[in-house]
Amino acid sequence: ARLAAVAYDALVVRRAATAFARTSKKTRFEQERPSSPALAQSPSPSKKNVNALCFDLARTDLGNAICSWRDFDAIALDTAMRAAIGKEPIADADADATKETPAPRVSGILQKTTLAAMEHLGLFEKVPAIKKQNVANFLKALEKQYASPEYHSAVHAADVVQAVLFILAPTGLESDLVHRIDPNAVFALLIAASAHDVGHPGLNNAFLCNTEDPRAARWNDVSVNENGHLHVCLSLLKEHKVFDGLPENLRKQCKATIGRLILSTDMAHHTRLVEEFVDVAANAIEAANLGGGGGNYCGSFAHHNRDDGSRIANWKDPTLALCFVLHCADISNPARPWSTAREWGRRVTEEFHKQGDCERARGVPVAALNDRNASGDVDKTTAANQAAFLEYVVEPT
């Protein structure tokens, strides 16, 4: 009976989502026209002509693409920023000459993307107690704490931040989700998105536990990577006094929300998170249809511009909705435009293979997904894996 109820709830939510998508699709794409040819045609970092476009890309205002699903390409922007930083004019007779300097480990893509997202939503005006300079300092330090695995890098974090923004405000209209969430909660969500993989070693939780890594021992084999990300995030938030201007109760609430958000990105929670969200969302829809309103369980995160059941503050567990937004953004890159999605697929495959190399070197069983020796045609294997991920994880979510 419970399975039948869950299935029915899922059907109700899916039908509602489909109806909304049909009515909003035209508006979304009308407002999503490419505003910059350079960004609209961002080349893959592997293309030979990337250097020819790097300076134009680096000079382009990020605001032109920050709210567009098609135009935003974190990989191309990161490549452009690194190339621009790595070229310095030579002060001699040859005015056209340049000298190459080592590419910087930090391009600034995460800081710039997150600040652009916050500014696009007007968060610094809505929450004046949070100072932009403190946030900028936090993000700069945060980006430096990201390691450089192929996939779980600061570039991925920037991609997730922009995906969160697009989910919150796809049309720029009053009907957007962002208007149903308190600005303090939106701040917490974007901070969590920016920090959700900080310090990721390119090795999954199972590997760290199976090899008795010190990090696994520290976090008792529970969401090892995610607990590490949260620890770094909270330490940097305190160091840079990001929430110092908020009342104590709201400061604690923001930190608790960030904690739950980052821990929810552990893929081990995927199935339970989706099931819980469908259940809570269906109940909220039912309560709204019955005119009940659902009650306000959100404390100081309450937002009083809306009284209908779609207002997140009216949900029994409003933070669950934020967790679901972050999770959707975290797994969304296969749904990016083809050239971008293909590069993300290549990167995650290489990260898996490098873990497989570590597994083989440590004498532990090599997971099939991580075994580069068994992959055969890597491109075909990557395509098959990405297609399966889309079918069984991304699309149902």
Could you tell me what each predicted segment is?
Residues 130-133, 184, 252-253:
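Short sequence/structural elements of tandem HEAT/ARM alpha-solenoid repeats
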Residues 133, 149-168, 198:
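Active-site-adjacent "gating/activation" loops or surface patches in catalytic cores
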Residues 133-137, 155, 159, 228, ...:
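Generic alpha-helical secondary structure signal
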Residues 186-190:
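Membrane-embedded alpha-helical segments that form the functional core of polytopic membrane enzymes
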Residues 1-39, 43-112, 116-123, 151, ...:
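Divalent metal-dependent phosphate-bond-processing catalytic cores, especially two-metal-ion Mg2+/Mn2+ enzymes
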